[in-house]
């Protein structure tokens, strides 16, 4: 689920 303004900003891994 890529619901972030980018392609990593949402990733908290």
Swiss-Prot record:
Expressed by the venom gland. One of its GO terms (cellular component) is extracellular region. GO terms for molecular function: metal ion binding; toxin activity. Its main location: secreted. Residues 11-13 form the C-type lectin domain. N-glycosylated. The keyword Metal-binding applies. It is found in: Secreted. Regulatory subunit of the blood coagulation factor X-activating enzyme. Activates coagulation factor X (F10) in a calcium-dependent manner by cleaving the Arg-Ile bond at position 234. Weakly hydrolyzes insulin B chain, fibrinogen and some components of the extracellular matrix in vitro, but does not activate prothrombin or plasminogen. Belongs to the snaclec family. Calcium is required for ligand binding. Heterotrimer; disulfide-linked. The heterotrimer consists of 1 heavy chain (a metalloproteinase) and 2 light chains: LC1 and LC2. This is Snaclec factor X-activator 1 light chain 1. It comes from Vipera ammodytes ammodytes. The lineage of its organism: Eukaryota, Metazoa, Chordata, Craniata, Vertebrata. The gene is LC1.
């Amino acid at each position: 689920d890529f619901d972030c303004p980018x392609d990593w900003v949402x990733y908290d891994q």
